[in-house]
Amino acid sequence: MHENIDRILFTEDEIKQRVAEIGAGITQDYKDDPDGVILISVLRGAAIFMADLARQIQLPCEMDYMAVSSYGNGVKSSGVVRILKDLSSQIEGRNVVIAEDVLDSGLTLTYLLKTLKARNPKSIEVTTLLRKKTRAQAKIDCAYVGFECPDEFIVGYG
């Protein structure tokens, strides 16, 4: 373990198991739709989580990426959101699952949900590996949550 890391919150095995459970949940929820889902990762933090999750989804599954920032130069959300890279895919009429690594203040995700809903997807849900409930400033309905975690700066997955 790195000298600057205080403790391990979740083991590799716990994370693998929970990602498999989330993938099974998504598979179950969309099993009757032949088009499956499009996973959208918020770069860069969620890219590894999304790739691991996609391997656990037993349906047609496309992946796309956005880069969105509300952190500026710090580690706390500034509330000012910028799209740095938009989607390559069209999402109109499609089932969208946004994959986040850490759901923190919810401000960035609120902006992202509003932006993507305007593109008329068939459905839109959110999955997050980690949710910091104590920091939430915006109410986000998260269909698939990996773990609740403390309101601390977190590193280590991906």
Where are these regions (language model features)?
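PRPP-associated nucleotide enzymes
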Residues: 1-158
